[in-house]
Structure formats: C-alpha cells, structure tokens
C-alpha cells in the first residue's frame, strides 16, 4: 500500500491505508496510516520483506516463521561483522516474517509475532496485522529489503537496523475471492525503515524490535 494521511478508518474505506511508524524520532510517530508491504492504489493495499523458503531458517529460536510459498520476503543484505549487529539484523528480518505470518494466519497471537517484538514494536506489528485482517486482505508476491546498515549503542544491548524496502512486486490479495490487487509501479513502492532492536534479557541471542520508524516514498531507495 502507499502512504496516506487519512485516519485509519477512512483509509480502509478507500482501500488505500498504509501504516508507517510507531515510536518517536525524526519520522512522525503519529503518521500511522500505511500498511507495510503493499502497493496502494484505488483498489488495493501495497507494501512489505525475504525469501521465506529457506528450511534452515523456518524455526529460529524454536519459533516457526515460515510463510506461504507465494508470500516471499527477500532480505538482500550482507551480515555485519559484529556478532550483536548480525544477530539483531537476523531478528529484524524475523520481525517482518512474524508480521506476515500473522497476516497469513489472521492473528496477532502467533508466536512469531510476539517472539521478535516488544513495546512499540509489538504495537506496530499488531496494528499492521489487524489492518490486513480488517481489510479482508492477505499478501502475495515478493517484498525486497536491501541496503541495510547497523549501528550499535555503547552498551551493546541496542542496535539500529536500517534498510530500504521495495514492495513494487508485493500485492494485497482478497481473502474471500483470491483477487490480487495489482498496482502500477510508483515512488510509493519504496520505504526506508529504521528498526530499534534490543537484546532480550533472558533469551539466548534473541533480539526484539522495540521501535519502528518508516520514511515512505523514499527516493533514496529507488
């Protein structure tokens, strides 16, 4: 979907809602009328993330993050050398897999959703999933994530994972009819994300998304 400034209810009525950010920062925290991972036109949602078919990655941390074959989240990035940043990047990807697993399963209660998110990050995930459910949509196609960077806090327990996302080939699909809501390529296909990942105090190597910031119509990602 593409970015709109309408209230969520109105955006849904127009079938063009898109969720942006939860949390404070440079991006507007209240700018939450965009559904991640879908192209947004007059009929459909539009935006999202890595190939989900890698068997070895289906159950990281014992959590099932597998997705349907037609829901392909691609994370086209290289792991950083620092161990904590590499782990945070992996779980930032799992955070997005969890969101779209929730979309597919039609629930915010799936373990993949709750394992990789906390605080504002969990609120963001729940809002995303509920927007898709309320709209009667699931997702299909390929959502590509790329040009990732990482930055660690001095204490080593917080990492910012930033990246671009291209949802030009990722579409909404009506659950009842199976109709794919195609959209034309546009600047609205490109988003720039900053995810604040924090290390779980008891989970061995587990990182959770605590805040999500999104710059929509991101020309630098084109």
Residue ranges and their predicted role:
Residues 15:
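Active-site-proximal loop/hinge segments that shape catalytic or ion-binding/gating pockets
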Residues 18-21:
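C-terminal motif of bacterial Sec signal peptides marking the signal peptidase cleavage site
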Residues 23-26:
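Bacterial signal peptide processing site
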Residues 32-59:
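Post-signal peptide N-terminal segment of mature Sec-exported envelope proteins
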Residues 61-139:
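Core segments of small alpha/beta cavity-forming domains
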Residues 108-109, 114-222:
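Structured, amphipathic secondary-structure segments that form assembly/contact surfaces
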